[in-house]
From Swiss-Prot:
Subunit description: Component of the Sca1 complex composed of at least gefA, gefH, scaA, phr, and the protein phosphatase 2A subunits pppA and pho2B.
Name of the protein in its database record: Sca1 complex scaffold protein scaA
Transmembrane segments: none
TPR repeats (start-end): 4-37, 166-199, 742-777, 1080-1113
Region feature PppA and pho2B binding, mapped onto this chain: 1000-1400
Annotated segments matching region Disordered: 1-22, 108-147, 246-349, 468-493, 686-734, 864-978
Single biological process term from Gene Ontology: aggregation involved in sorocarp development
The gene coding this protein: scaA
Organism encoding this protein: Dictyostelium discoideum (Social amoeba)
Length: 1582
């Protein structure tokens, strides 16, 4: 074997995943899979021929030295053991082949190369043979080998002996009574093997085999996926076979009359030559009728000469790489009878190569599969076609016959499968899960198992194909491969035996099929609710028969679980809104926790995009219709991808890039899809040229810049783009960054609040949800099934048309049978009924207000127009239909006309709200949704009337014709003549039959059938003749069930599934007359009509441009809202009855009326309803929150949360502000409300108190930074509220949970008041609390703070009588925070700064007390802000000896809490000058700079104090104790970090040079500073 090229990269692949078999996974017990060797030594694994695979522990490329001394000991010493017995030295160069070039095996190093099962202690007869070559032997006389003697005549050292030093007999599962004993023997066998191996490394982890359960019929077997790898080459090319392996014969006949071909053969254990070629001369052999290879116990590999027939290789029915199986034989080695597969590690370790039974020729799937991801597919296919020597074989016709490659051929290694020896868990299949959360949870578990228990990650599942059944491969004329089991008398008799056995099993299966239900269940057991269990129990005890309603109890399709799976809290989930560094740290932490030695690439790339089994290119293209382009990049795999001639192969895989930091990159009120479009902007020049075609584009703009998505996601392809193809990628990236920078936050007049950012993050999370659910309908379409040609798909469409055109086609028989036929794909079904562009709908998400900068860049004269054929750089002035487009009155762009589109070319900063249809403020679709022609970008027009019209216009423009026809100015589109199938179906629809069509939705739960029914419903609604008629009839007949089904059908194609609320038909039976009397029943019915019509209106506007039905639905919805307002106004007790129903014991009734009330609150079309609700809504919520039922309290909480949102937020604030005018302070009453009841041992706050607390704190944290707060916030920014809160805490005699939340509100209120400088000093000696009623609401003048109030708060903090109370520490900490905010004002601080009690009785004792961590931290922070905000006060502290007392606290006797906080704030004091200097450099333009001369003076005084008093010795003793810990005491890491930071500041900052010079005079101090300095980089800035 040639040596390796040192220039080749050894970076391991990061895209390998498990097999995609649907077979059942078996639990894999944990084994010690750590590689053997010295700790810290790189563990390399010899992987495949011609390349080198670095194991999981190697993160750098391994390069061999240029000059290697082959006579050195390092070269001759074996260190690694290859798969076939090849030994490698430390340079990974093969130096010896065990059993080939040595007359005898070396002691301690020669593994036995015979089959493990040949000498097994199993009572079952041996059924496997070794494929290992025999020893060197110059005598080629095959007569020496006896046919029925498997081991006796072989060279002794090649026999498998249990006494061998390295390997012992592999356990047989049939030799044990139970599985646990078998597991124990496997573990013991592995331990002995690893102990005997010593320093020699195995290339794989020691795998295992599993006994399979018995099955009774072939129909239950699932096809297993061969774990082929595009990146793999073979183990067996690691060495060349010697002459002893290949036996050349001259068609001589042995003693038994066997004939041999001229092809090279390998010897089997029974002495027979393993010639399996179809081109051999063995047709005279009567005992080998079907030309199978060595039936019975003879299994091996034939390596044919290039001119001598097929290259066949034995392959087991059991796929050991997946734990799945497919077999039909009943021989002793078949996995059906419970024995493990012989293709397991037993054959791998003992033989050095694979040994598979009951199989036929295996060939590399990469050469034949139709959906190959490999670009070398066509080249290999042509090679194989040239070298194909046998086409008569059925297996060859299927594309699996072996080529004529010899072992020396350049592509011979492609026939090997390196993954056969490793058991790999089955990957979860997406179709088996009802929700994405279930699938994600299963994928995480699977990935954890594979990573932690597999040394070399398995290949990508997209590279696998399904194997044909064995019954299809076996033939009677001898042309096929050997697929039979172990034969009778070594001949092909087992084929007949297997056939009769299968016939008996088929009869048994038919009898058992009616006795048991065969159900396909997910891998993870779904959640079963209590109602489902009760229903199943009733069903099992009933006498229900399978009649015409048997679809209700389908045994093939299970109902989805009623509860959605949720990931555990401990599982980290990838969020699109996370920053890159934070996301990377989380993934890195997960990898370290799962496997300490795994350092490969990211393995969870598929979490954002579930794998598609086949046809992924078409699926990604379909996704471009609803989603922004998911960042895809073509990965160039240079580590182990190479052809035999040395050429590189480039693969393209869809890999999601790391998520974008939207929070830092975007303004909170910037529109999401505009930004996503901007990311795809190539250059500014291409923008101007692309938008040139927008002058004449329809009503409001053209489509010259519409993009088209590609399957690989390489970028946005602008039509009309010119002049950008010659630029490099770096130039494009730079210009794109410049374009984004022009639209950055700095160019916008934006002051975002926390609430706005929170709302914007919610929008991004909603967008992420679209990514997760957008793949859920892929399996219904034709591109999900590989192997269909366009002609075959066209024939399927013609079949549907023939069924529709057949006589007697009606609704009950024809339509129902058509939608239930699973052979018809959904997309072909829709094409038959003229629904070519019917795709997923992206539901509306809340929009943020548009931001319009006042800067407009003159575009000047533009270049020639784009696709629209117009010229000029400006935008046309056609009348737009979207009211959200901002049109400045006097601004002009280009030709001086106001813009009609928010997308301004050539770097303008104008942004506005998203494109809309007919003024809907809450409805827009993502890029190129079913109506659009491509992705949304800044060059797309947004003012067309409907997406359907935009799609037609874009198609016309792309064809190069005019967007306007020559007659009447109407849009020129494709002919809209309905097809014959559409006319036939619409002829069946009338006012009576349409509700029957809707009932089909209740008769099936199959996703494909529901999709077809929904498509037909949409076809009816988009019809100009039928649409309005059917909806009008439903509303006239008050058929709410049909209206519900109609909303369900039209929302079926949502990108995110919609959970519709069902109208409770049995509500009359559940409610008492006191609730359901009067107008309640009619209002509830109208609310559901309003709700369903809203869903229909939003989606119908997307799928249809029929003005008649759109106008009717809109008017009907408004009419329902007006009638609700009239009923509400006439019945004054209606709101009382709704809340009475909310408090009922029944959860169903409470949830139903909660839904009704929420719809009424959000009903903006009826001002009457809004005004009536505002009267008593808050009072009823307050009463409902005291209910004893949890569902009623949930209703109160949900309603209160809605009141905190727009537009009800102002109403809630105004209600509390009104109570202040009445001197009631209702929100304070709500804050202090406690739970009632004698059973409560410890009083706790009520629900209304918790809700009010969250509301008040949220308002205080999100108040805009305006100079003067808005009047609406006066309900909380009020001096009366301030003193009431303060007195409620200071004068409290017993702390409760209510006091705790009041203290939190008080601390937040003080922060806001201090931020706006609303505190003022008062010389009054009276305590605050009594406020002039005439001025109590005038907060603009400030809240008067007297010294008496300050001393009351300080006295409260000094009081220790309530320290044992559980709430005391938190309450005191909040009050200390409030005191810090009060003392920030210089006037207020000057009134008490010279009071001795402030320091002697409060500050110094509190700094010394470390019992309460947060309290102590805030006390030291108070000391820090005294110096920072009040210049010159440090001199007073020094003169008054208070500073010396504070420094005395820092000693070895102080606790870690005190020392940590003291060091932290002292470090901040020393670095105060540098901090303020850096802050001045980064300040925003127009803001005042900080005068640093006062800080420099204070820091200088502090440094002089340290030098004069020799204070550094205190810190040196602490440092010495931490660094010279000889007592074994655990070191506080936070304290260690703070002391090193303190040292670093002294040695680094220029302001501390005086202290540094004084410190360096002491050798011990100098040593400590030098040691700390070595911890940091010299160039690192502080």
């Amino acid at each position: 074997m040639s040596s390796l090229d040192p220039s080749l990269s050894t970076t391991p692949s990061t895209n390998r995943r498990g097999t995609f078999s649907k077979a059942k996974s078996f639990r894999r017990a944990a084994l010690n899979l750590e590689p053997q060797g010295t700790p810290g030594q790189p563990h390399a694994f010899r992987f495949l021929s011609g390349e080198e695979y670095s194991g999981p522990d190697i993160i750098e490329n391994i390069k061999k030295p240029i000059n290697i001394n082959i006579e050195s000991e390092e070269y001759k010493t074996p260190l690694f053991l290859g798969a076939n017995g090849t030994l490698y030295n430390k340079y990974y160069i093969p130096i010896k082949i065990i059993g080939i070039d040595e007359p005898l095996p070396q002691t301690g190093l020669s593994p036995s190369l015979s089959s493990s099962s040949s000498s097994s202690s199993s009572p079952s007869p041996p059924t496997t043979t070794s494929t290992t070559p025999p020893p060197p032997n110059n005598n080629n006389n095959s007569k020496q080998i006896k046919k029925n003697n498997s081991i006796s005549d072989l060279t002794p050292y090649l026999n498998f002996n249990s006494t061998d030093q390295i390997y012992t007999s592999f356990p047989e599962s049939m030799a044990f009574d139970d599985y646990m004993d078998y597991e124990e023997s496997l573990v013991e066998w592995k331990r002995q093997v690893e102990q005997n191996l010593g320093i020699i490394q195995l290339p794989h982890s020691i795998g295992r085999t599993y006994p399979r359960p018995k099955v009774i019929h072939e129909q239950l077997f699932r096809k297993n996926s061969e774990a082929s790898n595009d990146d793999s080459i073979s183990y067996d090319i690691e060495r060349k076979l010697t002459d002893s392996d290949i036996k050349e014969t001259n068609s001589s006949v042995n003693d038994d009359g066997e004939s041999f071909s001229h092809s090279p053969t390998l010897r089997g254990n029974n002495g027979s030559s393993l010639s399996v070629g179809g081109g051999g001369d063995n047709h005279d052999n009567t005992s080998n009728k079907d030309n199978a290879s060595s039936q019975g116990t003879n299994h091996g590999v034939t390596l044919n000469h290039p001119n001598s027939g097929i290259n066949l290789r034995e392959r087991s029915n059991s796929d050991t790489s997946t734990g799945s199986f497919e077999g039909t034989q009943l021989d002793g080695s078949s996995p059906m009878d419970g024995s493990p597969s012989t293709g397991s590690l037993a054959g791998f370790v003992a033989n050095g190569t694979r040994s598979r039974t009951n199989s036929i020729t295996y060939f590399d799937q990469r050469n034949q599969r139709s959906n190959s991801l490999s670009p070398k597919h066509s080249m290999l296919q042509s090679r194989l076609a040239d070298s194909q020597s046998l086409d008569s074989s059925m297996y060859g016709k299927m594309g699996r016959s072996g080529s004529g490659f010899g072992m020396d051929h350049e592509s011979w290694f492609l026939q090997k499968d390196p993954w056969d020896s490793q058991l790999i868990l089955t990957e979860p299949h997406p179709d088996l899960f009802s929700t994405y959360e279930e699938y994600e949870y299963a994928m995480k578990n699977w990935a954890h198992e594979v990573i932690t228990k597999t040394s070399i990650l398995p290949p990508h599942p997209g590279q696998f194909i399904q194997l044909p059944k064995n019954s299809e491969l076996s033939t009677d004329d001898g042309s096929g491969g050997g697929s039979g089991g172990s034969g009778v008398d070594g001949v092909g008799g087992n084929h007949q035996l297997g056939g009769s056995a299968r016939h008996m099993l088929e009869m048994d299966f038919e009898m058992a099929k009616n006795q048991s239900n065969w159900t396909l269940r997910p891998i993870i057991r779904p959640i079963i609710t209590e109602e489902t269990m009760i229903f199943n129990r009733i069903l099992s005890q009933s006498n229900l028969k399978h009649t015409e309603y048997d679809h209700l109890f389908s045994i093939d399709q299970e109902l989805p679980p009623s509860q959605v799976w949720k990931t555990l809290d401990s599982d980290e989930k990838l969020k699109i809104t996370e920053t890159i560094d934070r996301w990377y740290r989380k993934k890195l932490t997960i990898q370290r926790q799962t496997s300490t030695w795994f350092r490969g690439g990211l393995w969870a790339n598929h979490f954002l995009m579930p794998n598609i089994q086949s046809g992924w290119r078409e699926s990604v293209s379909k996704k471009s219709s609803i989603l922004p382009p998911l960042s895809l990049k073509a990965l160039r795999r240079l580590d182990i991808n190479s052809e035999a001639d040395g050429k590189r192969v480039e693969h393209s895989f869809p890999i999601p890039e790391l998520p974008i930091n939207f929070n830092k990159l975007l303004a909170p009120d910037m529109n999401l899809q505009y930004f996503l479009g901007m990311l795809e902007m190539p250059t500014a020049h291409s923008l101007s040229s692309a938008t040139g075609g927008q002058q004449q584009g329809g009503s409001g703009g053209g489509s010259g810049g519409s993009g088209s998505g590609s399957g690989s996601g390489s970028g946005l392809n602008m039509s009309g783009t010119s002049g950008s193809s010659g630029k490099s990628e770096k130039d494009k990236d730079k210009e794109t960054a410049n374009y984004i920078a022009m639209h950055s936050i700095n160019n916008t007049t934006n002051v975002g609040t926390k609430e706005d950012r929170r709302q914007y993050t919610k929008i991004l999370q909603t967008y992420e949800q679209r990514l997760q659910f957008s793949f859920r309908l892929d399996a219904l379409n034709s591109w999900s099934e590989g192997g269909y040609t366009p002609m075959e798909l066209q024939e399927k469409k013609l079949d549907i048309e023939q069924l529709v055109a057949a006589p007697g086609f009606d609704l009950q028989n024809g339509v129902w049978s058509l939608v239930n036929n699973s052979a018809h794909f959904l997309d072909k079904f829709q094409e038959t009924f003229d629904q070519v562009d019917l795709r997923l709908y992206a539901p509306a998400i809340p929009m943020l207000p548009a931001i319009v900068p006042s800067v407009f860049i003159n575009a000047g004269g533009g270049s020639g127009g784009g696709s629209g054929g117009a010229s000029g750089g400006g935008i046309s002035t056609s009348s737009g239909t979207s009211p959200n487009i901002v049109r400045p009155g006097s601004s002009s762009i280009g030709g001086g006309q106001p813009p009609s589109s928010p997308h301004i070319p050539s770097g303008s900063s104008l942004l506005s709200s998203p494109p809309n249809r007919q003024g809907s403020t809450g409805s827009f679709s993502f890029i190129g949704s079913p109506g659009g022609g491509g992705k949304i970008s800044p060059t797309n027009s947004s003012s067309l009337e409907s997406p359907r019209t935009q799609s037609q216009l874009a198609a016309v423009v792309e064809r190069g014709s005019s967007p306007r026809s020559h007659s009447g100015g109407s849009i020129s589109t494709h002919p809209n003549t309905p097809s014959v199938s559409s006319n036939t179906f619409l002829s069946l629809i009338n006012t009576d039959s349409f509700p029957e069509l809707l009932k089909f939705l209740d008769l099936t739960n199959e996703k494909l059938a529901l999709g077809k029914i929904s498509s037909l419903v949409l076809l009816v609604l988009t019809s100009e003749l039928k649409g309005t008629m059917v909806i009008e009839n439903i509303l006239f007949s008050k058929d709410l069930q049909s209206l519900y089904r109609l909303a369900r059908a039209i929302s079926f194609f949502d990108a995110v599934p919609l959970d519709l609320f069902t109208y409770p038909t049995h509500l009359n039976e559940m409610l008492t007359p006191s609730i359901f009397k009067g107008s309640t029943q009619e209002v509830v019915r109208l609310v559901f009509v309003y709700y369903y019509l809203g869903i229909i209106q939003e989606r119908l506007n997307f799928f249809s441009n029929n003005v008649g039905i759109l106008g009717f639905v809109n008017s009907s919805r408004k009419d329902a809202a007006e009638r609700i307002g009239i009923q509400f106004q006439n019945d004054r007790e209606f709101l009382y009855k709704i809340f009475k129903a909310l408090g009922r014991k029944s959860i169903l009734v409470s949830n139903c009326f909660l839904f009704v009330l929420i719809q009424l609150i959000k009903m903006s079309e009826s001002p009457t309803v809004q005004s009536l609700l505002k009267g008593e809504l808050l009072t009823h919520i307050r009463d409902l929150s005291a209910s004893k039922f949890s569902h009623s309290r949930f209703a109160a909480k949900r309603l209160y949360q809605i009141l905190q949102e727009d537009p009800w937020k102002e109403f809630l604030m105004a209600s509390y502000a009104e109570s202040i005018k009445k001197n009631e302070s209702q929100h304070l009453t709500d804050l202090t409300t406690m739970k009632e009841g004698p059973k409560l041992a410890i009083p706790s706050i009520s629900l209304i108190s918790e809700l009010t607390f969250n509301f008040c704190v949220g308002v205080l944290e999100n108040i805009n930074s305006t100079p003067i707060p808005k009047p609406i916030y006066k309900f909380i920014l009020n001096d009366s509220i301030f003193f009431q809160l303060c007195n409620a805490i200071v004068k409290c005699k017993n702390f409760t949970q209510s006091t705790q939340i009041v203290s939190k509100v008080f601390a937040s209120l003080c922060k806001v008041l201090a931020k706006f400088n609303l505190f003022k000093n008062s010389d009054s000696i009276k305590s605050g609390g009594k406020v002039d009623p005439k001025k109590q609401n005038d907060v603009e003048t400030g809240v008067a703070i007297s010294p008496t109030l300050l001393f009351e708060i300080i006295g409260f903090l000094q009081n220790s009588s309530l320290d044992n109370n559980r709430y005391c520490s938190i309450i005191k900490t909040n009050m200390l925070i409030a005191l810090r905010q009060l003392l920030k004002q210089s006037e207020i601080f000057d009134s008490i700064k010279k009071e001795g009690n402030l320091y002697n009785k409060f500050l110094i004792p509190a700094c010394r007390d470390g019992k309460n961590v947060e309290f102590n931290r805030n006390v030291w922070r108070l000391f820090f802000q005294m110096i920072r905000f009040h210049h010159g006060h440090i001199e007073y502290l020094e003169k008054s000896k208070y500073l010396n007392a504070l420094m005395d606290i820092i000693s070895l006797n102080a606790g870690n809490v005190v020392l940590t906080n003291a060091l932290h704030y002292l470090s901040k004091l020393f670095s105060l000058v540098s901090y303020e200097t850096r802050k001045n450099a980064l300040r925003a333009p127009g803001t005042l700079s900080i005068d640093t001369k006062y800080s420099e003076k204070d820091v200088k005084s502090l440094l002089n104090f340290f030098v004069e008093r020799s204070c550094f010795i205190k810190f040196h003793m602490i440092y010495k104790k931490l660094t010279e810990n000889t007592e074994g005491i655990q070191i506080d890491q936070r304290l260690l970090i703070n002391i090193t930071t303190f040292y670093r500041i002294i040695s680094f900052l220029p302001s501390c040079q005086k202290l540094l010079k004084d410190t360096l005079k002491n050798p011990e101090y100098k040593t400590g500073i030098i040691q700390v300095s070595k911890m940091y980089k010299p160039s690192e800035t502080f």
